[in-house]
């Protein structure tokens, strides 16, 4: 079986290692020839996974044509690059039998769509799955125990993809709910930013746990509005991913939130921030108008948007959010 992964960052490489440990040959696509040479000759990916040696059966390429005949193609690019990647696959006339996987986090930046809907726009006949879980890429690469959720409408795809990853160290779960898992992947980074601010501003762990609980409510509300009839939040790729992202201080979004909480305005930190690495910044900009349009009470999204994109004072925005949540629960 020929498996390709588009995106040789930390998470893409970690996914490749999971498959390689189960003796599947994987082709990693990266745009940079120097990156390709490092992976193929040194079996390392030092920029993203320092001190990790890659299995020899992982091969890299910078030639997109090398991967278009693969039976399974997993996209692990930043969310703002997914549409262009799908367009590229379409232009290369990949087989209708090729199974497309999405491991990217977030929403489409052009049309504010779920990434699965972008795939359907271009590759409507191809089977599709979403993969997510509470996983730090470095721990996965080290071979530590981890868990994954495989979301796919077709039961056969759920089973086949789950089987590829399952091992004594990898727990897998499956669900038909491809909507909630994608909504959670977009919301979790925003919730993590606010959770980081909460700790930096010394509101305490109780408050942080309450915010995460509120975040789950907002994920469910948005997932229903997006078409999920019964949001499946119990999955590793939903509540598990949210908990890890919000509590791991090594999480980029949580750390960014903590750093942000040392100040009163985002502008105090903006020159030291790469918004391309902090998915929650972009996600808040996309999600806020969608929640307003759907008339949803997503107070965490409102708070994040006001801080990151509307210049609000951080302490004031947090207090307003807490008051709204308190009022709503009465």
From Swiss-Prot:
Molecular functions (GO terms): glycerol-3-phosphate dehydrogenase [NAD(P)+] activity; NAD binding
Reaction(s) the record says it catalyses: sn-glycerol 3-phosphate + NAD(+) = dihydroxyacetone phosphate + NADH + H(+); sn-glycerol 3-phosphate + NADP(+) = dihydroxyacetone phosphate + NADPH + H(+)
Keyword field contains Lipid metabolism: yes
Ligand binding (sn-glycerol 3-phosphate): 105, 133, 188, 241, 251-253
Lyase among keywords: no
Cellular component aspect of the GO annotation: cytosol
InterPro entries named in the record: 6-PGluconate_DH-like_C_sf, 6PGD_dom2, G3P_DH_NAD-dep, G3P_DH_NAD-dep_C, G3P_DH_NAD-dep_N, NAD(P)-bd_dom_sf
Binding site for NADPH: 11, 31-32, 105, 137, 252, 277, 279
Record-listed E.C. numbers: 1.1.1.94
Cellular location(s): Cytoplasm
Active site: 188
Keyword annotations from UniProtKB, A to Z: Cytoplasm, Lipid biosynthesis, Lipid metabolism, NAD, NADP, Nucleotide-binding, Oxidoreductase, Phospholipid biosynthesis, Phospholipid metabolism
Gene Ontology BP term (one): phospholipid biosynthetic process
Biological pathway: Membrane lipid metabolism; glycerophospholipid metabolism
Family: Belongs to the NAD-dependent glycerol-3-phosphate dehydrogenase family.
Function: Catalyzes the reduction of the glycolytic intermediate dihydroxyacetone phosphate (DHAP) to sn-glycerol 3-phosphate (G3P), the key precursor for phospholipid synthesis.
PANTHER family membership: GLYCEROL-3-PHOSPHATE DEHYDROGENASE, GLYCEROL-3-PHOSPHATE DEHYDROGENASE [NAD(+)] 2, CHLOROPLASTIC
The protein, known as: Glycerol-3-phosphate dehydrogenase [NAD(P)+]
Taxonomic classification: Bacteria, Pseudomonadati, Pseudomonadota, Alphaproteobacteria, Rickettsiales
